[in-house]
């Protein structure tokens, strides 16, 4: 996507942000007061359902407020941080607390992810608040809250590596539990799960030397590839797979190459070109990554032990076998 040619002047951005945040604060107050009133009146389940329907316009309004702040933030990046400190932060810090409705916590999480991702190291002062919240909400009952939380953990692991380092192991534990849940790949949970898989890969990439269970985390991560719901996550994880095969070979494939079949299956699925989970197909890897995969598969055809190659070959379906053989040099067979 090309950068916008028009940049909203900072003075105007300041005024817009002030007005938007004031309106967001009033919207949050209206919702919390309504929830408090409902609790005092002893609303039953049906009453709360009706109240939630009444909140739909407030939820849409708040989403628009958050999007507006996000657009302005991404325009000005680190220059926006003083405005963020003055207007969005005082409004959204309280909304990140557990007693708030999930939609408000989600709004707050999204805006703090944006500032950490786009406003430079000066924004990292919010990590001490945001990271514990993200870890807590990664297990939320609502999948959209989990998805935002694990995305935030991924962004923090890459953008704020020093501060994130103390959270590496507990975060990996949370993500592994999420990914391995029995219902993790059903339709309602797929996006949150794939974001968790992407987060595991990113953490292993940037913090691998500090992970004493890397030999367990990488195969778990790889077993959930390819990702198919979100193109950005799919392409990123495909790139990470190639990088790990080159730099963490034995950690990924196992000391006896016991995980080689998982790697071959993931790469051939990507090369076959699986469709995404939505209405439109997504590109699971960039052209360069696909080229790298073809080279890696050709190398594996000549370097893997025969038993590992045979096991990998037997695990493939017809389309995967066809694409695998098509990328090998003339005369080279993958099956020994």
Spans of model-derived segments:
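Karyopherin-beta/Importin-beta family HEAT-repeat alpha-solenoid scaffold
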Residues: 1-336
